[in-house]
């Protein structure tokens, strides 16, 4: 069985793992059926506040 020769510090470990995350694909986007703006899937639209046909974030109250 392979064993580490020396303890790997948290920063060195995280630097190694960051290389994998940097190479991942860019996030996919879908168009909002309500306003047509590009948005992330399975999340409320940042432009109009709709998700799955319902208004879940009232944009008028925030402004």
UniProtKB/Swiss-Prot annotation:
Organism: Pelodictyon phaeoclathratiforme (strain DSM 5477 / BU-1)
Name of the gene: rpmF
GO cellular component: large ribosomal subunit
Protein name (record): Large ribosomal subunit protein bL32
Region spans: Disordered: 1-27
Family note: Belongs to the bacterial ribosomal protein bL32 family.
InterPro entries named in the record: Ribosomal_bL32, Ribosomal_bL32_bact, Ribosomal_zn-bd
Record keyword Ribonucleoprotein present: yes
Record's compositionally biased regions (Basic residues): 7-18
């Amino acid at each position: 069985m392979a064993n580490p020769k020396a303890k790997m510090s948290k920063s060195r470990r995280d630097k190694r793992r960051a290389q994998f995350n940097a190479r991942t694909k860019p996030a996919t986007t879908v168009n909002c059926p309500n306003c047509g703006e590009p948005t992330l899937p399975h999340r409320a639209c940042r432009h109009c506040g709709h998700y799955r046909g319902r208004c879940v974030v009232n944009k008028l109250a925030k402004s």
